[in-house]
C-alpha cells in the first residue's frame, strides 16, 4: 500500500477524484484521448496513471504541462513514463515529511552490503542505492540551493553507517563550507576528522589515493569500503588546486575495484565547475530541483528527467543509466542524528552494526521506533 493511502482522509480522496476528472476533461477539450486508470500517492505528490489512445502522442500532453498545472491549481506537473502507460505527477496540497528513523520500519534489516537508504519512491516503497552495483559506484548529487543536497548526503551516510560495521565501512568527509557535515563529527565510522580547509582536504585525499594505490599494487582485498563524500565539490575546486582535482579524478576512475566510492554534491554541475573527467566517472546522478531543462540535462546526463519541475526540499530524481526514479529524500533532524550517533557508538563498542540482521533485535527496534524530531522541518 502506498505510504500515505493508509492515512488518507475523505477530503483527500475527494480531491483526487476531482483532479482526475479535471485531467480527463482538459485533455478531451484538446481532442486528446486519455483516461486516468490508476493513482499512486506519496507523501508529497500523486501520480495519475494515464492510458492513452493509440493515436495519442506523448508530446501533445507534454506541451500542455503548464495549462494542466494551471487547471489543477498547482505550481507544476511532471510527466513520467511507466512500463505500459504515461504518468502525470501532481503536488499534494498537504505534503507530509519523510523521516529516516520512521522509514527504517519498512526497510529490511539485512540489506546488501554498502546499500544506502535514500528515502521513499513514488510507489510508496523505501528507495535504496546499492553503491557496489556497477551502474552506481560513484554519485553526483546536484540541484539548486535549498533542494536538499546536503540533507540527502547526511541521510545517505548515516544509513550506510547503520547497516555496516566499522570493520566493513569507513567514511572520509570533506566540507569546504564547514556546515554540512558538522553534525556528523561524532560518527564512529570516520576515517579521519572532517576536512574543512583546502590543506586538510588535500592531505586527506592524498592519504585515500595512496591507500587505493596500495590495494591495487598489493592486490589487497577491497575492505573496508571507504566512502569519500564532498559537500559542494565545486567550492572545493574553485581555487584551482590541481592536486585536489587530480586526486578526485583518480578516485572516480580507479576507486571501484579497490573498494572506494566517491559522493559529490554541487549546485553547479556545469563543466566550468566540475571537470568533465570527474563528472564522466560519477555514473549515478541524484538530481534535485534545477532552474531549467538545460540544467537538468547537464546534471542528469540524459534528457527529459523533469528535474526542472521538481519541488525542492528533498524532491529528487535518481538517474541510474537510462532508469529515472522520483523519490522524496528522507530527512534526519538534529535530535535524530544525535540518537543515531549514540546508537552507533554503543554498537561500535560491541563490534556490531547498529542495525543487526534481525528485525526483533533490541538495537534495531529501539532505534527505529523512537519518534521523529518534533521540531524537524525540510529546510
PLM regions with names:
Residues 1-5, 10, 22-38, 43-49, ...:
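P-loop NTPase catalytic phosphate-binding loop
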Residues 89, 93-95:
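Pro/Ser/Thr/Gly-rich intrinsically disordered low-complexity regions
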Residues 329-359:
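Charged, low-complexity intrinsically disordered tails
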Residues 362-379:
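Terminal-proximal interaction/regulatory segments of ATP-powered molecular machines
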Amino acid at each position: 500500500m502506498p505510504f500515505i493511502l493508509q492515512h488518507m482522509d475523505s477530503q483527500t480522496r475527494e480531491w483526487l477524484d476531482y483532479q482526475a476528472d479535471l485531467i480527463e476533461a482538459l485533455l478531451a477539450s484538446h481532442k486528446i484521448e486519455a483516461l486516468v486508470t490508476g493513482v499512486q500517492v506519496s507523501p508529497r505528490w500523486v501520480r495519475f496513471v494515464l492510458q492513452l489512445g493509440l493515436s495519442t502522442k506523448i508530446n501533445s500532453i507534454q506541451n500542455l504541462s503548464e495549462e494542466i498545472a494551471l487547471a489543477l491549481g498547482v505550481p507544476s506537473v511532471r510527466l513520467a513514463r511507466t512500463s505500459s502507460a504515461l504518468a502525470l505527477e501532481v503536488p499534494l496540497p498537504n505534503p507530509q515529511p519523510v523521516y529516516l528513523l520512521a522509514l527504517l520500519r519498512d526497510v529490511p534489516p539485512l540489506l546488501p552490503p554498502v546499500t544506502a537508504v535514500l528515502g521513499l519512491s513514488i510507489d510508496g516503497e523505501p528507495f535504496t542505492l546499492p553503491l557496489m552495483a556497477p551502474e552506481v559506484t560513484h554519485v553526483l548529487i546536484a540541484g539548486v540551493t535549498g533542494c536538499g543536497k546536503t540533507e540527502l548526503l547526511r541521510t545517505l551516510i548515516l544509513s550506510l553507517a547503520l547497516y555496516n560495521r566499522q570493520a566493513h565501512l569507513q567514511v572520509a568527509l570533506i566540507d569546504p563550507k564547514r556546515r554540512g557535515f558538522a553534525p556528523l563529527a561524532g560518527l564512529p565510522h570516520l576515517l579521519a576528522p572532517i576536512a574543512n580547509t583546502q590543506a586538510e582536504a588535500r592531505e586527506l585525499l592524498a592519504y585515500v589515493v595512496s591507500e587505493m594505490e596500495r590495494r591495487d599494487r598489493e592486490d589487497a582485498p577491497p575492505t573496508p569500503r571507504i566512502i569519500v563524500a564532498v559537500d559542494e565539490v565545486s567550492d572545493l575546486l574553485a581555487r584551482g588546486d590541481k592536486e585536489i582535482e587530480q586526486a578526485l579524478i583518480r578516485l572516480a576512475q580507479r576507486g571501484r575495484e579497490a573498494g572506494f566510492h566517491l559522493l559529490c554534491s554541487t549546485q553547479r554541475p556545469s563543466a566550468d565547475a566540475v571537470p568533465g573527467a570527474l563528472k564522466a566517472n560519477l555514473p549515478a546522478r541524484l538530481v534535485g530541483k534545477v532552474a531549467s531543462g538545460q540544467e537538468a540535462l547537464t546534471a542528469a546526463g540524459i534528457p527529459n528527467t523533469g528535474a526542472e519541475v521538481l519541488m525542492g526540499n528533498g524532491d529528487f530524481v535518481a538517474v541510474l543509466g537510462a532508469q529515472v526514479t522520483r523519490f522524496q529524500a528522507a530527512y534526519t533532524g538534529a535530535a535524530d542524528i544525535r540518537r543515531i550517533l549514540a546508537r552507533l557508538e554503543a554498537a561500535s563498542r560491541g563490534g556490531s552494526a547498529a542495525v543487526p540482521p534481525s528485525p526483533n533485535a533490541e538495537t534495531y527496534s529501539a532505534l527505529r521506533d523512537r519518534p521523529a524530531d518534533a521540531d524537524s522541518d525540510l529546510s
